[in-house]
Amino acid sequence: MPVFEASSIQSVVLHRVGNKATEEGYVLSTEPLHLTEQLQDVLVRYFLGPFKVEEYYRLYSDDGVEMNPLYRHCADIFSDPECLMESSCDIARLLYDASTHANIKGGELFVVYFSGCMFNGETMDAIGLFKSETKESFLKVLHGDEEWSRAESDAIATARYELEVQQGINPAKLDRGAIIFNTEAEKGYVVSVVDATNRTVDALYWKDAFLSVRQREDEYYNTHTEMQAYKKFVTDELPQQFEGVSKADQADMLNRCSNYFKQNDNFDLQTFTQEVIAQPEVIDSFKEYREQYQQEYDVQMPESYDISESAVKKQARAYKSVIKLDKNFHIYVHGNRELIEQGEDEKGKYYKVYFKEES
C-alpha cells in the first residue's frame, strides 16, 4: 500500500472541464493555486485519503506506451516540474476530448505535483489527477456587527444572524482520481485509480478513454485473477462437466480455495490443485479451463507467485458460499462439507444440517 504520511503538495493547478458531447467547453486556469497551510492540509486529505487499495495499473497504448498522450505529459512534468502549468492545460484538453458520453458530468480538474510519496519502501514524487463532479449544499452562517455589553462578570454581545445556502465540494468525497508514481517509467509508471462513480457504463471513460490504463501484473493482479478464474470454474464450468455437483459441493470448493489463499503466503498451482481440488479428473478440467481463461480474457496467470492479502480480502466478498432455497431460506456454508446432506422425498428436496450448538 502507498504511504502518504510525509507527502506534500508542491504545486496544484485547477481547471474547469465540461462535457464535450453537449459542447460545454472548458476553462483553463492562468496560474497555479496559492495554498495556505490550512488549505494544503485539507487538500492532501481530500486527494490522497481514498487511495487505500493495493490495486495498480500502468499507462498503456497498443502502439507502445510512448504513444499514450498522458504518459508523455507525465514524463515532461517529472523531467521538469516547472512545466506543470503548461502540461496541465494539455491534460485538461485530453479529459475534455474523453468526455463524449452524454451522462458525463462536467467538473473541476485538479492537476497536482506531490513530493514525499512512498511506494514499495521508496520515496518518490507523484502526479495526481483529480476530478470533482458532485456539488453538495452547505449552510453558511452570516451575522452583522456585534454590539457588546457586560452583565456582571460575563461579556455579552448581540447580533443579527442569517443562514445562506451555498454549493461546494465535500473534501471527504473524491469522485475520481489517479496518482501516477514516478517509478517504472519504461513500463508506463505505477498508477493507482479511484472512481467512486464506477457503477455506470459511462464511468469507464476515466480509466479507458482518459487515463488509458491496464492492470499492473503484480501479486495483487495474480491473486485477484486466480481467485476470479477459480470461482467462475466452480460456479459455471464444473456443473456442466460433472453430473451430480450440488450447490453444497460448490460451496465447499469455494471455501477450500478461500482458506488456501488465507493460510498461505505463496501460490503454487500443483499444491493448490492437490489440496483444494484433490480429484484428478477435476484437476485436469481446471487446468484446461485455466488455459482457456487466459486466452479468452487476455490475462497472464503464472503457476507460482506471492499471495496478496488485500486481494484475498477483496475477493472474500465474492466468495460467500450461500445456498438459496426458493424464497424461504438461505444456507451460509462456512466449513465442514460432511455436516450438510442433500436429499429428496415425497415432500420435495431438502438439506439436512448437523450442528452442536445453536445461537
Description of each model-found segment:
Residues 1, 111, 351-355:
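Short low-polarity hydrophobic stretches
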Residues 2-315:
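Long, hydrophobic alpha/beta structural blocks
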Residues 283, 287-359:
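C-terminal, beta-strand-rich globular interaction domains
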